Amino acid sequence: MWVKICGLQFMKDAVAAVEAGADALGFVFAPSRRQVTPERVEALISGLPPETVTVGVFVDAPMEEIRRAVTLSGLKAVQLHGSEPPEAIDQIGLPVIKAIRIRGPEDLARLPDYRNAAGLLLEPYVEGQAGGTGQTLDPTLVRWAAQTLERAGVPLAGPDEPLTPGRPKLILAGGLTPDNVADAIARAQPGGVDVSSGVENGGVKDINKIYAFVAAAKGVAR
């Protein structure tokens, strides 16, 4: 199972995520309590293995701001977590994860518009919040999302495949913890999972929870 640990700010946590076996590390550039600067991320990335998949998270940021952050920090991928249009995916030049906030089945129809993405991160819609809500998504909606994309002729990446543009990976996010991620994977059958607050204590990353989350996610038999 592909696992992304998001909202990293400190070297010890990033190193722990890599050592635990996470497939991708997320750094939030959008205004939030987890926000980091391009310079800070460059310093963090410099201490990680060169093959580490590092993802910058942006919310409705100008394209020039995204490109500047990518250039300064050395990111390997970008996550668009706002209301960015499908054409934004082709303007970045890196694999793109597009976050989609889901209210219900009616929101699934627009997923094929983002067919050029490397990942589609599905999370529950919460008014006024772009991610980090701690709310869980109905697993049925993830399975329906896969069916919607398959009917539209969009090939999907499996849980053991890397981020590949044009072959989006369905990534489950929202309310996941070391205690519930295995059950969530079994029920939703996603191509990956993403966690931030679920591996924290009091808003601070907990290394033991990072290890436990990755182990639980990757221990699920499919």
UniProtKB/Swiss-Prot annotation:
| Name of the top EC class for this enzyme | isomerase
Q: Which UniProt keywords apply?
A: Amino-acid biosynthesis, Aromatic amino acid biosynthesis, Isomerase, Tryptophan biosynthesis
Per the record, the pathway is: Amino-acid biosynthesis; L-tryptophan biosynthesis; L-tryptophan from chorismate: step 3/5
E.C. number(s) listed in UniProt = 5.3.1.24
Which SUPFAM superfamilies does the UniProt record give? Ribulose-phoshate binding barrel
Its domain of life? Bacteria
Per its UniProt record, what Gene3D superfamilies does this chain match? Aldolase class I
* Molecular function per GO: phosphoribosylanthranilate isomerase activity
Kindly list the biological process annotations in GO that this record carries. L-tryptophan biosynthetic process
Q: Which reaction does it catalyse?
A: N-(5-phospho-beta-D-ribosyl)anthranilate = 1-(2-carboxyphenylamino)-1-deoxy-D-ribulose 5-phosphate
Q: Which HAMAP family match?
A: PRAI
- Family note: Belongs to the TrpF family.
Instruction: Please give the name of this protein.
Output: N-(5'-phosphoribosyl)anthranilate isomerase
Q: Which organism is it from?
A: Symbiobacterium thermophilum (strain DSM 24528 / JCM 14929 / IAM 14863 / T)
Q: What is the lineage of its organism?
A: Bacteria, Bacillati, Bacillota, Clostridia, Eubacteriales
- Per the record, the gene is trpF
